[in-house]
Amino acid sequence: MLLIFLSSLAILTQVWYNKNMRIQQLHYIIKIVETGSMNEAAKQLFITQPSLSNAVRDLENEMGIEIFIRNPKGITLTRDGMEFLSYARQVVEQT
């Protein structure tokens, strides 16, 4: 459990210090999880679905983790994604 916490803390620290990282991307991740759909999240965020997908892909590349598993039936959080979501919510609540 401590290892998971430290790993998540390292991810969170990376988020804060990465100049290309924006809080908006964290909002995107949270909205995708809330809606369960990239399409619906994009509609509610008033952006295009390709823009949302690119923002998520950029975040995954910057962080070096896969947040979502994408398949024809929808998306699901990966294990790393679940940890990242927890800390993303904390960061968003504090801003």
Locations of the language-model features?
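Alpha-helical linker/hinge and terminal dimerization helices associated
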Residues: 62-63, 84-95
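The N-cap/first-turn positions of alpha helices
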Residues: 22-25, 49, 74, 81
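Short, positively charged and aromatic/hydrophobic N-terminal segments
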Residues: 4, 8-17
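A short LG(V/I)-centered, amphipathic sequence patch enriched
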Residues: 60-77
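Helix-turn-helix DNA-binding elements, focusing on the entry/boundary residues of the two helices
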Residues: 37-38, 56, 70
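Short helix-boundary/capping micro-motifs
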Residues: 30-46
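Hydrophobic residues on short alpha-helical segments
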Residues: 26-33, 78, 85
